A protein has these predicted regions:
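Active-site palm subdomain of RNA-directed nucleic acid polymerases
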Residues: 1-26
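Secondary-structure transition/capping motifs at alpha-helix termini
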Residues: 9-14, 31, 52, 180
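Non-catalytic, peripheral interaction segments enriched in hydrophobic/basic residues
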Residues: 18-19, 50-70, 95-227
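Catalytic palm subdomain of template-directed nucleic-acid polymerases
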Residues: 23-50, 105
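Short, well-ordered alpha-helical packing segments
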Residues: 3-7, 23, 39-46, 118, ...
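Short hydrophobic "helix-edge" motifs at membrane interfaces and signal-peptide entry regions
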Residues: 9-11, 85-88, 93, 184
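Short linear motifs embedded in intrinsically disordered, charge-biased segments
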Residues: 161-321
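Short, conserved micro-motifs composed of acidic
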Residues: 40, 55-91
Length: 321
């Protein structure tokens, strides 16, 4: 409640809060414009802090410029100050446990995630000799899966090379828990343990985001991420039961920041997955789960998990991207 009026001191930038973490963001292609606007806004921030008898440690305040590799910024010519201290740009920042780099390619986050998952593998490699498989699975979900799933609908948009790094670590983890040889195939092991692969974990979290959108369970800002096809195109009444849950695919201008955007990726994945309006969970069409019959989030996640596990029995390289 104490800082809910912070945004009122800003006129040209946007801000966000989570607990004691606050960010200010501004968008411009001109370095001098960025310098002028940010310096002006930071002066207003200082005034607001003084009026509210608060202080901010400039040494812990970080500055980052987001840009593509093709459009670099000469940082040395951009002077941004906070309370007399110049803020030097950094290559990446940590916000809410996510490492966000200046190119938005998630390389730094994947590197840090790899270290955490490697440590988890080390713990499991020692624990497996003194604990049952059930205990190892509990530890897997506690110290491996919990890190893996956090924010994966965002960092999952990273490069194929980065996904492969995490994929290798997950397969190693599966082999460790089951005492399987280092080069053994893992499809049967994933099915045996009831664990889905990292690529499918990413897909499931992205599909889950769309599911929440369709059921109006997202915050208002995130509800603007997607648009129903029926709100853009005229749909015949007889097709409404299926098409009214299909998403409009936005037009994109760039490959890097268009096709890899969460808006485009989630919409494309959802429409592809539910092209027929039903989900195959065991190969028998009679047991297909129709989209309109999935009433709860728990049922949705359970259905998607069954679908992905079944896919490992058909094609080991089946990926929904």
């Amino acid at each position: 409640m104490y800082i809910n009026d912070f945004y009122l001191c800003l006129s040209q930038t946007r801000c966000g809060h989570f607990a004691d973490d606050t960010f200010i963001i501004y968008n411009s292609k001109k370095a001098k414009t960025i310098e002028t606007v940010i310096n002006t806004e930071l002066k207003e921030v200082i005034k607001w802090l003084r009026l509210n008898k608060l202080s901010l440690n400039a040494g812990k305040t970080e500055l980052i410029f987001f840009h593509s590799k093709k459009h670099s910024i000469d940082y040395e010519k951009v002077y941004i100050y906070f309370n007399g201290v110049r803020l030097n740009p950094v290559d990446h920042i940590k916000y809410l446990g996510m490492y966000i780099d200046k190119f938005l390619n998630w390389n730094q986050h994947v590197n840090n995630l790899s270290k955490q998952l490697s440590r988890a593998n080390g713990v499991l490699s020692k624990l497996r000799y003194n604990a049952s498989l059930d205990i190892c699975l509990q530890v897997y979900y506690a110290i491996f899966f919990s890190y893996l799933i956090y924010g994966c609908n965002l960092w999952g948009l990273t490069t194929e090379e980065n996904i492969c790094k995490i994929e290798i670590l997950q397969k190693k983890c599966i082999r460790i828990m089951t005492f399987a040889p280092f080069n053994s195939h893992t499809n049967d092991l994933f099915i045996e343990l009831g664990i889905i692969k990292v690529r499918d974990i990413i897909s499931m979290t992205q599909l889950s985001l769309v599911y929440d959108f369709l059921n109006e369970c997202l915050p208002s800002d995130l509800m603007r991420l997607f648009t129903l096809s029926s709100n853009v195109h005229t749909v015949p009444r007889e097709l409404n039961s299926t098409v009214n849950r299909h998403l409009y695919i936005p037009k994109v201008n760039t490959t890097k920041y268009g096709l890899d955007s969460i808006r485009y990726h989630c919409a494309t994945l959802w429409n592809k997955m539910f092209k027929t309006g039903a989900v195959n969970i065991d190969g028998d069409e009679k047991n297909n789960v129709h989209l309109t019959k999935i009433k709860t989030k728990k049922h949705f996640n359970k259905t998607m998990k069954k679908h992905f596990l079944y896919s490992y029995t058909i094609d080991p390289y089946l990926v929904y991207y």
